[in-house]
Amino acid sequence: MRREVVKGIIPIMKQGIFEKEIFIQSDVKTVVDLIADYSQHHKIHPLIEKVERAKDEPAGVRRYFITDNLQWGPFKFKIKYQADIISVTENVVHTQAYQSPNTFVENVTTVTPVQNGVTLHETITLKTPDLLFNYAFQQAQTAHAEMLKRIKSFVESHRGQGV
């Protein structure tokens, strides 16, 4: 883990976990393929403006640079962060993201077959400096709740067409 030290001060970090879940009328492969294809995330993630594939990636990792549009009260701003797809299996997508200063997000998404579809379940772990935590945690919870609704809508509206 990287730590930034400013004038000898190590920031106080705070961590939180939240989970989101939604039923989707689809198959596991279709949903996993969409989640693991970051080039499609500007269509499903409410904050994402731009997704760029990194030129250099560690072995076995798909690395992207993502630009989000954020708002804090009357202030609108953009952030750019690194997002890595660590692993993709038949039904699990594991990702990690990092944005300065010291903001880390880990996402483990599991897609489980159920009658007439699948259940998409996300577990998000956010670690950030204490002063940023409440804002970042609220933004992440709101964005991921909306993203799951958009994944459901996108996948179900494209059934039989390939996503």
Residue ranges of each PLM-predicted region?
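Hydrophobic ligand-binding cavity/cleft-lining segments
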Residues: 2-61
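Short, solvent-exposed secondary-structure boundary motifs
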Residues: 11-14, 39-45, 71-77, 98-102
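Short, surface-exposed coil-to-beta transition loops
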Residues: 17-19, 76-82, 103-108
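Beta-strand elements of well-folded, non-transmembrane domains
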Residues: 24-26, 68-74, 87-89, 101-103, ...
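Hydrophobic pocket/interface hotspot
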Residues: 31-35, 41, 83-85, 120-122, ...
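Glycine-rich portal/gate segments that line the openings of hydrophobic small-molecule binding cavities
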Residues: 52-100, 150-158
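Beta-strand/loop substructures that line and gate deep hydrophobic ligand-binding cavities in soluble
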Residues: 96-146
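Charged phosphate-binding loop/patch that engages nucleotide di/tri-phosphates or the phosphate backbone
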Residues: 159-163
